[in-house]
Design a protein with these regions (language model features):
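Active-site beta->alpha N-cap acidic-glycine motif
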Residues: 1-28, 64, 71
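C-terminal active-site subregion of NodB/CE4 polysaccharide deacetylases
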Residues: 37, 44-128
């Protein structure tokens, strides 16, 4: 690809948020939350310690950008996947509200398991 003049960094710059974008979002009143560090698609298959590391590194990164006193209280489960260890880890990190990626009913759900519809589900439902 490089021999054709394609720079991977140029596509990264166009696709992904940078630290400045995150500051802009916060300054506009948006709430930033955790989503993991490496976005494991089956985070619920990781050990409790691996899950804690995923979310703790994500939290540390956000605080390093936003300032150490920044409150990060929200999160969204990667691919809607989680288990009891995940919920315990998140509570231990001070996370108060979490979102799943579908609207299915979860009996006895907590504030860390709120339903929301993922855009991929919506696109699939309307046939785009």
């Amino acid at each position: 690809m490089s021999h054709k003049g394609f720079r991977v960094q140029s596509i990264n710059d166009a696709l992904w948020l940078n630290d400045g974008h995150l500051h802009d979002l916060v300054n506009q009143g948006h709430v930033l939350g955790l989503h993991s560090t490496t976005h494991p698609t089956v985070i619920d298959n990781l050990s409790r310690e691996q899950q804690r590391e995923e979310y703790e590194r994500n939290l540390d990164y956000l605080k390093s950008i936003l300032g150490g006193n920044a409150e990060v209280k929200a999160m969204s489960h990667p691919c809607g996947r989680y288990n009891a260890d995940t919920l315990s880890v998140l509570r231990g990190l001070g996370i108060e509200i979490g979102f799943r990626s579908n609207m299915s009913h979860v009996e006895g759900r907590s504030l860390l398991e709120l339903p929301r519809e993922d855009h991929a589900n919506i696109v699939r439902k309307i046939g785009i």
